[in-house]
Amino acid sequence: MAAALVSVSASAQQKVFFYSPNPGGGLRMAVLENDAWNDLGRLCSSDYGTWGAEKKMIHPSLCRANDGTWRLVFQLNDRSPLFGASFSRDLVTWRPQDYPRVSGPKCLNPVVVPAGNAFHVYYQTADGATRRIGADTEFRHFIGDEAVKADAKMWQRDTVNIKGEQMIGQIFSITDAELQHVRDDFRLQGEKWAPTNERMHDDTQKLSIPSVVNATLTVSPNQEKTISDKLIGIFFEDISYAADGGLYAELVQNRDFEYTSKDHRGWNATTAWHSSKPIEIATEHPLHPNNPHYALIWPDTLWNEGWDGIVVEKGKKYIFSMFVLAGGQKQNFLIQLVGQNGQVLAQSKLKTHASDWQQFSTVLKAKASDEKGRLVIIPQKAAHVGIDMVSLFPQETFMGRKNGLRKDLAQVIADLHPKFVRFPGGCMSHGQGLENIYHWNHTVGPLESRKPDFNIWNYHQTRGLGFFEYFQFCEDIGAEPLPVLAAGVPCQNSANNAEGIGGQQGGIPMADMPAYVEEICNLIEWANGDPATNEWAKMRAEAGHPKPFNLKYLGLGNEDIISTVFEERYEMICKAVRERYPDIKICGTVGPFHSPSADYTEGWDFTKKHPNLQYMVDEHY
């Protein structure tokens, strides 16, 4: 395509103007017609960082290479040490943006200029100095960052009037053919999106149907198609309390006292817990390093509100358990389920005696029902006692599994007869920033040793519904597990970290990628390995499943922007998995939006260039 652009360079030229009307307006294009500038539409927009606070394109700067292709840079905000960079062959299709990092704390007013077959990006610092970074021909890799002196003319812009408003940008000349190509694309996109602008007000006219409709139906039985027996599956995403408070049968909220403001604004270790006196939280002698907070209680009533209340059903049994730290003292507790009006729905005594953390349990049988019950814990003796991992499960879970799933919800899923189950996300898989990438190995083992985390959807993950429970559920309903893990990058909508870096945050540092690749390979060993020879497989066996789960599929990446940072890490992971486990079928991704998005185009282009990396890809709509 580049050669074609050069070959028509001698044809008639048209003046066009590139500009951004406001930080959220993206890069737009106008054309000079009859001595007036007319806006054609938006060419691309920023995909950096969180929705609302970010996604801004400030001071866009373009240059055209000798081969007719285009390079674009822009400022992201006034606080990040990054700039946006993209590439286009025809002004219509733009490659997914990269966000190179600069040496200082801020990157202001970047401009791009050709430098032979490569490019230079100049930018200004907060103190007014000028620095320069080099970029390769493909505009994918950026090296060096040095202080330079630059002519102020480099930042000069053109000013034009568009419908009475003064706009600042750059004027270029392109050929008639190039301009028509852009016009055609805007027309096609307008036609494609026109149905989304339909209004119910127009339905009476548009949907008018005559009283009699004649139609002919032709059946061609010889043209039947074979339908895949694995076509229909389900996608479990931990969003809107789908796990804790949802499919996972645990009835106690914040059972681990690990809620923090990272989970949700205003939350803390005592959220969902109540007492007549302030609840004391300690960390000096934790149940497990991954679960450092616990409650210290005196003989005062402590109660938990559950998930918008605890649904208690008459005649049903509930298993209560908690870990107790009493320093060798005997301590008895009265455990109750209490209704909205104060009625005791069920109760049982719990006797404890332990010198260190020890788990105790009892069974409660409900004598009445209430949809808004609560769990009450009453110490029977004056003593300072530590408690943690306070749990209440219905005795009846799906398939009777310990630490299992809600019987009603799980049965609905089972009745769909899905052939596969995608888990655990979604945006939760790649997480809110690098620190929040979902690590499967944090979700297996004893519950108290699992590592909780905040959820990108603004709540908490106990990890009680972890990979063991997920694989067990797939086996119970006859579905293939399709676990989805991050491809070395977090969600592109991640907020800025302490350094002001958001979005994909540069991905997991390449120096740390071998360890991350090993983590993914360990999942395959955990699922399919021999407990006699592999430690991860031994962990699976100790959890109650000595036979392999027979994992066949592995998802890598979740609707990521197909940036250079993503492609490099995705390829690294795929090559390692394919080399060590050739029978595992990898499911890749082609971005967050369907055609004609930049990520969809780049994702499919990358997939076709690397056909041996993956067995299939996920198109996100």
Regions inferred by a protein language model and the residue ranges of each:
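Carbohydrate-active catalytic/glycan-binding domains of CAZyme proteins
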Residues: 11-208
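Noncatalytic carbohydrate-binding groove/subsite architecture in carbohydrate-active enzymes
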Residues: 366, 373-381, 530, 540, ...
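Aromatic- and acidic-residue-enriched segments that line the glycan-binding/catalytic groove
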Residues: 431-447, 491-539, 543, 603
